[in-house]
């Protein structure tokens, strides 16, 4: 689950 969050954050940041 955390991997999905970091993936999305990486897309914005």
Swiss-Prot record:
Major localisation: secreted
Localization per Swiss-Prot or TrEMBL: Secreted
Keyword line: Amidation, Amphibian defense peptide, Antibiotic, Antimicrobial, Cytolysis, Fungicide, Hemolysis, Secreted
Modified positions (Phenylalanine amide) in chain numbering: 13
UniProt superkingdom: Eukaryota
A GO CC term assigned to this protein in UniProt: extracellular region
The UniProt record lists the keyword Cytoplasm: no
GO biological process terms held by the UniProt record: defense response to bacterium; defense response to fungus; killing of cells of another organism
Tissue-wise expression: Expressed by the skin glands.
Family according to the record: Belongs to the frog skin active peptide (FSAP) family. Temporin subfamily.
Function: Antimicrobial peptide with activity against Gram-negative and Gram-positive bacteria and fungi. Also shows hemolytic activity.
Name listed for the protein in its UniProt record: Temporin-1SPa
